[in-house]
């Protein structure tokens, strides 16, 4: 159990002491709780003063240890504190129960949690401007149990229970039921309550339920209501038999639970005594319990005048009846101590009852002065516990009942009883109170270890001083979770433990303490045991271990064998400590290693791989299962006897020089040889005594270090050849070797360390005379990914050599651990080694050595709390202080200037307060429309005339501004300055004047004559399309409107126009407008906009610059619908007069001589469309100064003639290997070829027909994927290239089949830039070796005209612009005609329906929607439920038909080859006018990383793109339709992460468009779209938007997308249009994609500086190499991670922790990449944080990249 409630009661034991002392934890609510409500509404202050502010509160509800659970501060602040509390108390409950979270992971464990407070939800979700995605699950009731299940990986039922105040006892009932019914083996139940807001308290005040004192006085005569309380309780339930079997500490047994409802009472909140009795009887019945045997009832007792007496009477009826006066049933309630926890109340009462039955003590009632007189206490058989009372001895078994009721009528009841579980100390053989043991501590972060150590030390000195140390060790090892940062402390006594823990707490390690972080998930933690050879002996070795029964039992049978063979007892030798003879040492080395191995096994440590060194190979073979221990004893004994023949004749020295060099130096000599290859820099030389001494002296003279090996035998030298035959004879029939069965066995006797030779007599003869290849064996283990080595020896002999070998391999994450060392306690040394293995993450079965009883009461995890609370916005600012956006002005707080006629209006302007409902961008920056400024002047002055309105500088909304409108006697002006400039700057120079005017309060001019609308229309004669104005403005770069007006009738020429305008087209004529009806801005915005279109013969992006005069002729509200009459002004070339009329033609307002200015930088007619629509250009590539060192080529192709044709053009100086397919490489590995100088080149085969394209494309893409997977997964140092020929033009079947490789290659290059060299498309069959070497960092390279070229996005070519003499009469080619039929694949998808809407809007009258799923028959449409997923689709189709179109839905899978015939037949059946346009928008998106792709998933994505495109191409051949639009994506152009299959399919569509254009199809066009906002498969989400931003681009709205379509329609002879916008970059920020190089805009250095961790005001110089570079990178990267996670400082980030464990989710990953890229100026691949999951890994990667650059 666990709990956390008011009064600093943070666990059940603290709570119990508080109960015994009758403490009342009530107090005032912390000030911060209600503070947001004081800011939210000025009326709240008075109300809050009247609201009960006292209760039972946690001192620091906001505190949470999110880092422990891997929850970032950003996510944590969006979580209800109830979720945070519940997570922590659940962890504490599991620790209290001795059940590890890891043991429950993946299990059917259930979680039921009482919760019914939504205070935090209201607090954060009502702060609408700051609502975020995580707040949904973060504030939901279900989020409490679901969060527990998620973080513990529990897969059983997980349910929130809301039964008001009965919730948590109902949760207990559900947990019991889940176990009884077999749904779950373990249930975690509980409840929580957090009081974050005043709302419900206010409700309860009104209902009279809450005491004004905010405290509970259960059973008291003066009860006035209850005090609300907060906190959480968690209880772990398990089947009794399972708990006994598992050795759990059973605190109590639940005998019965029941839940019911009290039916229709006097009121829904009124209690019902009968229902309370009934539920109690039901619980007793379940447990077959006599109520007279229940000694105590924990009552609900909320302290209400009605509730308490009702409940007591019900309890009396059940438990008090038939009681003897001297044996009453005791009752009490916990609420006066900790308050009424509402949803958590039942669980807290349950915990109190468990403590009572467990301890046999009844806690006294707090806050009880006089018992209520509404109960006849003398005759009810009940007694309130008023003093601490021992449980009556008359009870055989202590039983208690718990009541809990909800104000909605839920009644619940539980009956529990004590359980006595006899524990016995059953230590394993050989263990005793004085034997050493190991204490294990851990934490998710390193800084937790000292805190945990301090807590355990303090406990051992106090509450745990009487606990058995072995039990404490068992608890920590077996009953607690082991996190990534670990400490293992070997101790012999409690005093020893206290001292060692103190050292760790103070940051100093004890000699027997090991501390480390476990190796990351990408590092193999399996252990290689290394059995070293001769030379580890020391006096007294083994003496201590002989006292260990495990050691003794392992060596005693071997002792008998040796003694029978040679009359010598190894055990006796070990006890004597006298064994210098070489033959004795060999035998004892073997004996020790076998004994140590047995002790290690007893501690739960086993090898996964084994290396034997020299004589150590014998024990290694035994432990691996290749020999028996007895065979090993015979072998070592007989060989040692033979050694006596050569004793005293030889010697050995260790030489500090590589094996190969010394071997070359000694070549040809028999008296002196290299015997052991120890490490890359050392070896051992053996030979005759004289030769060794002579060579040692020579080495000394040459300053080469040598060390003498303690032996008089020249092991592993020709001197032992004479012993080979005798050895073979002596072993004949004595060995029966087998293949190793227990672990992988590496050989040091064979040239191939992985050799599988049987360990027979021949092997051991070779082992005796051949050199020892230790370096090779260790290197093989490293190559097989082993990183943990344990030397099994009496003293570390080869550890240094192995360390050298590992460091020479450049491996950083490894460990080399010895077992014993000279003159150190053996038992402690072995435990120390086991502890070191544990701290590195190696598997240790602690149950094998610490399986006995365990200790309860150990300190729980020490939380590292940090305040985590959402900062709530200030709420709505008074309209007296800021402008009202619905009035469309900038008039905020009005301030009169004393003594003058000046009035100043001040306000703040930002994106949240823009005074217009739409969007009004100018070159990407949102500005206030001119109409809004004029409206502001009119409303500020009350003027009817404005003269000389000068619009000087647009009012931009790209950053928050302080705005002032200054109105004087005749003048008015608008000024602003950026708010950040305002800080600390009182200088007027920062104010910008935007607009000025002179004003008159009344007009002397007469109202103009009424406009004769019909006569004007007749005079003009030319009817324009209703969309003329919008289309014209869109064409010149006005992509959106600030107001939603629409033209419904339009006549015009270059001299005059008249247009009927509806200012609010979506609002019915008699309905209320969605803005202030007095606002002139909407209709005036139409006037300024339509007024500019009179210059359509000279299309330019223009904006109003000056208006000579503005007249308002009416005091009435402006018309919703009216006429705009536009005339070309005669006084200037670019000015117009605009009259605003009502529907009758009466002039209500007029702009006289509105002059327009052309916007600087507008590039020709395309305007800002040029920043949206692009072409793919292929300028020459820039070669690198240093070529790639490619000297070997592996050409892989199944097309033999093609492969050989390319090979024939390669210089003979380059080694070329030809392979048929990737499997040849994967199977044969060709390791000698796979070096840094090697390039693997994939050459796809030629394809002869279009029918073969789909299957060939699948084959080619999958073969390339197999190659990249092989190279990446095996960490090969090679680069992969693809070579194609003339793919770019898409003219041939081969080009179409190869095209998917283009998109695939771009994504591969993005995800694996270090392994992928690029795709090179040649124009002739000449191998592009020079291009491969010199064109670096490019994903796709085309060689045309002999020049290597790379793709860049550029504006559409102006010479392709269709020159139109009459834009109203000539229909653009890519838009529909009323007489045609138009077909859309993917037609029922969101994107397809938007396309249909667009085509209908553009004039299409017949549309066919093709979709795999189709729709139900039309006769069923009217019966469709609104909730049906098809309802929106049907509604959309009916809407299109209501607009005059006919829509046909054709169910057809376009991805099937048979679809062509089916489509043709269907079109014939429909018998519609000819199809004039096709839009292929069908597709499937299956995002997977390159390494995770499967053939099936890839084929599923390719089919609708490739087969679907070819089907349409067959049915509608080139030139048979006006337009053939293919919906592609820009994802493959910029290498969108996870879109390898989607990118491949889309690049095929790009090629198909080129293929058709090459056949004269002018209407074939592929659109490479960016993400459509909220639409389609590429719909922009938080993740997509972050990924787009990381690529330097944005999404588009549907309106922008179709504007791009219309823009592209004006160009001919182009086969594609790339639709995206580039984001501006900092001055020195790396280019996200080379494709953007020509369209990107960079900020100036001063403008791009910010204060984020990724760019400080002072640009630091990045070190170029060494420790300084790594230190810099570590700090910078941790700073970026901290910024993403909203951590206060970089120091909060653990460099060794996985980013995912820190709380970095998929969206944050993209943001992190951006920050890293900006901070370190290095392009970051999308998969970097997946392949380099910690800051430490990232430091290594960036160090290499930064060093290169």
Swiss-Prot record:
Stretches for region Product template (PT) domain: 1169-1629
Ketosynthase family 3 (KS3) domain span: 1-418
Localization (cell): Cytoplasm, Cytosol
Reaction catalysed by this enzyme: 3 malonyl-CoA + acetyl-CoA + NADPH + 3 H(+) = 6-methylsalicylate + 3 CO2 + NADP(+) + 4 CoA + H2O
Positions where O-(pantetheine 4'-phosphoryl)serine occurs in the chain: 1706
GO terms for MF: 3-oxoacyl-[acyl-carrier-protein] synthase activity; 6-methylsalicylic acid synthase activity; fatty acid synthase activity; phosphopantetheine binding
Gene3D superfamilies: 3.40.47.10, ACP-like, Malonyl-CoA ACP transacylase, ACP-binding, Malonyl-Coenzyme A Acyl Carrier Protein, domain 2, NAD(P)-binding Rossmann-like Domain, Polyketide synthase dehydratase
Residue span of region N-terminal hotdog fold: 888-1006
Disulfide bond entries: none
UniProt KW Repeat keyword: no
EC number: 2.3.1.165
Region listing for C-terminal hotdog fold, in residue ranges: 1021-1165
Chain segments carrying region Malonyl-CoA:ACP transacylase (MAT) domain: 528-843
InterPro entries assigned to the protein according to its UniProt record, in alphabetical order: Ac_transferase_dom_sf, ACP-like_sf, Acyl_transferase_dom, Acyl_Trfase/lysoPLipase, Ketoacyl_synth_AS, Ketoacyl_synth_C, Ketoacyl_synth_N, Malonyl_transacylase_ACP-bd
Keyword Glycoprotein attributed: no
Active site location: 165, 300, 340, 920, 1085
Region (Dehydratase (DH) domain): 888-1160
All copies of domain PKS/mFAS DH, residue ranges: 888-1165
GO BP field: fatty acid biosynthetic process; secondary metabolite biosynthetic process
Name the UniProt record assigns to this protein: 6-methylsalicylic acid synthase acuA
Species for this entry: Aspergillus aculeatus (strain ATCC 16872 / CBS 172.66 / WB 5094)
């Amino acid at each position: 159990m666990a709990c956390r409630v008011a009064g600093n009661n943070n666990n059940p034991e603290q709570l119990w002491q508080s109960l015994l002392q009758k403490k009342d934890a009530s107090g005032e609510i912390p000030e911060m709780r209600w503070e947001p409500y004081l800011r939210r509404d000025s009326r709240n202050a008075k109300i809050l003063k009247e609201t009960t502010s006292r209760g039972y509160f946690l001192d620091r509800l906001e505190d949470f240890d999110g880092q422990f659970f891997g929850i970032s501060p950003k996510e944590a602040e969006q979580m209800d504190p109830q979720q945070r509390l519940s997570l922590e108390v659940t962890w504490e409950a599991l620790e209290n129960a001795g059940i590890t979270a890891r043991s429950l992971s993946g299990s059917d464990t259930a979680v039921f949690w009482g919760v019914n407070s939504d205070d935090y939800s209201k607090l954060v979700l009502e702060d609408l401007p700051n609502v975020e995605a995580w707040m949904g699950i973060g504030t939901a009731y279900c989020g409490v149990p679901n969060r527990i299940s998620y973080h513990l990986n529990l897969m059983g039922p997980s349910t929130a229970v809301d039964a008001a105040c009965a919730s948590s006892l109902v949760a207990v009932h559900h947990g019991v039921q889940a176990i009884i019914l077999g749904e779950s083996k373990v249930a975690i139940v509980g409840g929580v309550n957090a009081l974050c807001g005043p709302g419900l308290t206010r409700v309860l005040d009104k209902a009279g339920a809450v005491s004004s004192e905010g405290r509970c006085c259960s059973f008291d005569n003066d009860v006035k209501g209850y005090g609300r309380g907060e906190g959480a309780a968690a209880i772990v339930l398990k089947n009794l038999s399972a708990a006994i079997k598992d050795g759990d500490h059973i605190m109590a047994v639940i005998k019965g639970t029941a839940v019911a409802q009290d039916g229709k009472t006097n009121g829904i909140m009124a209690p019902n005594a009968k229902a309370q009795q009934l539920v109690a009887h039901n619980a007793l019945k379940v447990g077959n319990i006599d109520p007279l045997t229940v000694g105590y009832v924990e009552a609900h007792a909320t302290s209400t005048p009605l509730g308490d007496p009702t409940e007591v009477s019900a309890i009396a009826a059940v438990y008090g009846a038939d009681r003897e006066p001297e044996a009453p049933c005791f009752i009490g309630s916990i609420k006066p101590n900790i308050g009424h926890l509402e949803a958590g109340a039942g669980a807290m009462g349950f915990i109190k009852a468990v403590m009572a039955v467990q301890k046999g003590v009844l806690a006294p009632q707090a806050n009880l002065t006089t018992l209520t007189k509404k109960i006849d206490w003398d005759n009810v058989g009940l007694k309130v516990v008023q003093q601490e009372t021992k449980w009556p001895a008359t009870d055989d078994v202590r039983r208690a009942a718990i009541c809990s009721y909800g104000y909605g009528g839920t009644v619940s009841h539980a009956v529990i009883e004590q359980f006595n579980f006899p524990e016995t100390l059953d230590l394993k053989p050989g263990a005793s109170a004085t034997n050493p043991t190991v204490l294990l501590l851990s934490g998710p972060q390193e800084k937790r270890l000292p805190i945990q150590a301090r807590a355990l030390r303090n406990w051992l000195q106090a509450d745990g001083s009487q606990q058995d140390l072995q039990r404490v060790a068992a608890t920590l090892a077996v009953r607690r979770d082991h996190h990534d940062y670990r400490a293992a402390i070997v101790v012999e006594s409690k005093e020893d433990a206290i001292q060692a823990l103190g050292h760790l707490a103070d940051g100093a390690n004890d000699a027997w303490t090991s501390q480390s972080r476990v190796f990351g998930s990408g590092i193999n933690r399996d252990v290689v045991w290394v059995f070293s050879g001769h030379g580890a002996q020391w006096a007294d070795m083994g003496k201590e271990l002989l006292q260990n029964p495990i050691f003794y039992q392992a060596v005693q049978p071997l002792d008998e064998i040796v003694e029978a063979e040679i009359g010598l007892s190894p055990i006796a030798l070990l006890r004597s400590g006298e064994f210098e003879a070489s033959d004795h040492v060999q035998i004892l080395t073997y004996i020790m290693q076998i004994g140590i191995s047995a002790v290690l096994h007893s501690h739960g440590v086993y090898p996964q791989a084994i290396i034997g060194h020299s004589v150590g190979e014998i024990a290694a073979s035994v432990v691996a299962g290749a020999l028996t221990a007895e065979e090993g004893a015979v072998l070592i004994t007989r060989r040692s006897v033979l050694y006596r023949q050569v004793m005293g004749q030889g010697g050995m020295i260790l030489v500090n020089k590589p094996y190969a060099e010394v071997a070359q130096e000694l070549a040809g000599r028999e008296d002196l040889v290299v015997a052991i290859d120890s490490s890359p820099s050392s070896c051992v030389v053996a030979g005759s005594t004289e030769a060794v001494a002579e060579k040692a002296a020579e080495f000394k003279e040459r300053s080469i270090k040598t060390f003498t090996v303690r032996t008089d035998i020249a092991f592993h030298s020709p001197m032992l050849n004479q012993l080979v035959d005798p050895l073979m004879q002596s072993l004949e029939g004595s060995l029966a070797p087998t293949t190793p069965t227990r672990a992988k066995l590496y050989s040091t006797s064979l040239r191939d360390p992985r050799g599988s030779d049987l360990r027979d007599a021949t092997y051991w003869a070779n082992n005796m005379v051949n050199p020892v290849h230790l370096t090779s064996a260790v290197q093989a283990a490293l190559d097989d990914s082993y990183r943990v080595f344990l030397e099994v020896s009496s003293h570390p002999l080869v550890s240094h050599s192995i360390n050298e070998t590992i460091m020479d391999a450049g491996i950083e994450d490894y460990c080399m651990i010895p077992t014993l060392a000279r003159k150190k306690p053996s038992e402690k040394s072995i435990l120390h080694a086991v502890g070191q293995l544990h701290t590195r993450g190696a598997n240790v079965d602690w149950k094998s050595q610490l399986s006995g009883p365990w200790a309860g009461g150990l300190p729980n995890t020490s939380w590292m709390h940090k305040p985590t609370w959402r900062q709530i916005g200030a709420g709505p600012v008074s309209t007296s202080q800021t402008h009202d956006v619905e009035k469309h002005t900038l008039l905020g707080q009005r301030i009169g200037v004393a003594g003058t006629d000046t009035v100043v209006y001040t306000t703040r302007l930002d994106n949240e307060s823009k005074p217009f409902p739409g969007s009004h961008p100018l070159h990407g920056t949102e500005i206030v429309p001119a109409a809004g400024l004029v409206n502001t002047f009119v409303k500020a002055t009350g003027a009817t005339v404005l003269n000389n309105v000068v619009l000087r500088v647009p009012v931009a909304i790209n950053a928050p501004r302080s705005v002032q409108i200054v109105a004087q006697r005749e003048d008015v002006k608008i000024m602003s300055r950026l708010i950040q400039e305002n800080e600390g700057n009182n200088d007027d120079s920062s104010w910008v004047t935007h607009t000025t005017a002179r004003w008159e309060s009344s007009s002397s001019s007469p109202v103009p004559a009424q406009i004769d609308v019909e006569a004007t229309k007749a005079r003009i004669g030319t009817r324009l399309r209703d969309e003329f104005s919008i289309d014209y403005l869109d064409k010149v770069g006005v992509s959106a409107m600030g107001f939603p007006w629409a033209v419904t009738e339009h006549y015009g020429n270059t001299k005059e126009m008249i247009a009927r305008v509806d200012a609010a087209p979506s609002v019915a004529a008699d309905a209320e407008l969605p803005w202030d009806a007095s606002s002139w801005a909407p209709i005036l915005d139409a006037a300024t906009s339509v007024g500019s279109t009179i210059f359509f013969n000279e299309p330019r992006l223009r904006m109003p610059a000056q208006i000579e005069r503005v007249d308002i002729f009416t005091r009435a509200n402006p018309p919703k619908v009216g006429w705009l009459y536009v005339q070309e002004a005669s006084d200037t070339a670019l000015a117009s007069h605009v009259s605003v009329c009502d529907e009758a033609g009466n002039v209500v307002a007029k702009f006289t001589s509105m002059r327009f200015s052309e916007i600087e930088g507008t590039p020709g007619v395309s305007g800002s469309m040029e920043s949206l629509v692009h072409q793919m250009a292929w300028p020459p590539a820039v070669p690198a100064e240093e070529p790639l060192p490619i000297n070997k080529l592996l050409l892989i192709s199944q097309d033999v003639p093609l492969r050989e044709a390319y090979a024939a053009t390669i210089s003979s100086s380059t080694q070329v290997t030809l392979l048929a397919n990737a499997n040849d490489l994967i199977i044969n590995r060709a390791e000698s070829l796979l070096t840094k100088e090697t390039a693997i080149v994939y050459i796809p085969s030629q394809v002869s027909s279009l029918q073969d394209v789909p299957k060939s494309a699948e084959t080619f893409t999958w073969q390339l994927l197999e190659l990249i997977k092989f190279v990446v997964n095996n960490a090969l140092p090679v680069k992969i290239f693809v070579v194609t020929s003339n793919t770019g033009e898409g003219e041939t079947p081969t080009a179409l089949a190869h095209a998917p490789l283009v998109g695939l290659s771009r994504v591969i290059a993005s995800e694996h830039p270090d392994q992928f060299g690029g795709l090179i498309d040649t124009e002739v069959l000449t191998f592009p070796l020079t291009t491969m070497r010199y064109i670096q960092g490019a994903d796709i390279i085309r060689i045309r005209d002999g020049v290597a070229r790379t793709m860049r996005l550029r504006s559409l070519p102006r010479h392709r612009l269709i020159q139109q003499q009459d834009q109203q009469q000539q229909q653009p080619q890519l838009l529909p005609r009323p007489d045609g039929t138009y077909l859309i694949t993917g037609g029922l998808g969101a994107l397809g329906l938007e396309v249909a809407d667009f085509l209908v809007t553009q004039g299409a009258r017949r549309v066919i929607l093709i979709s795999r799923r189709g729709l139900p028959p039309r006769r069923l449409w009217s019966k469709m439920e609104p909730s049906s997923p098809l309802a929106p689709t049907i509604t959309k189709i009916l809407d299109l038909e209501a607009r005059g179109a006919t829509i046909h839905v054709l169910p057809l899978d376009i991805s099937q080859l048979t679809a062509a015939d089916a489509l043709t037949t269907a079109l014939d059946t429909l018998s519609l006018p000819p199809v004039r346009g096709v839009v292929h928008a069908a597709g499937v998106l299956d995002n997977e990383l390159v390494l995770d792709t499967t053939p099936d998933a890839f084929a599923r994505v390719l089919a609708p793109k490739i087969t679907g495109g070819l089907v349409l191409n067959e049915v509608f051949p080139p030139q048979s339709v006006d337009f053939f639009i293919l919906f592609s994506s820009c994802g493959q152009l910029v290498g969108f992460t996870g879109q390898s299959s989607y990118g491949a399919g889309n690049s095929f569509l790009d090629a198909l468009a080129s293929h058709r254009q090459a056949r004269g199809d002018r209407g074939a066009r592929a659109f490479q779209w960016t993400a459509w906002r909220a639409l389609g498969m590429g719909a922009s989400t938080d993740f997509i938007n972050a990924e787009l931003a990381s690529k330097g681009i944005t999404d588009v709205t549907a309106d922008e997308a179709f504007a791009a379509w219309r823009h592209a329609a004006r160009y001919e002879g182009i086969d594609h249009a790339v639709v995206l916008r580039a984001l501006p970059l900092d001055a020195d920020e790396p280019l996200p994609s080379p494709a953007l190089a020509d369209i990107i805009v960079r900020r100036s250095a001063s403008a791009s500086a910010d204060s984020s961790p990724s760019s400080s005001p002072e640009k630091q110089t990045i070190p170029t190499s060494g420790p300084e570079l790594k230190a810099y990178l570590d700090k910078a990267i941790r700073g970026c991670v901290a910024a993403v996670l909203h951590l206060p400082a970089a120091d909060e980030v653990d460099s060794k922790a996985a980013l995912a464990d820190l709380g970095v989710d998929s969206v944050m990953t993209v943001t992190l990449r951006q920050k890293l890229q900006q901070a370190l100026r290095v392009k970051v691949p999308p998969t970097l944080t997946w392949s380099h999951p910690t800051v430490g890994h990232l430091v290594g990667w960036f160090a290499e990249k930064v060093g290169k650059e």
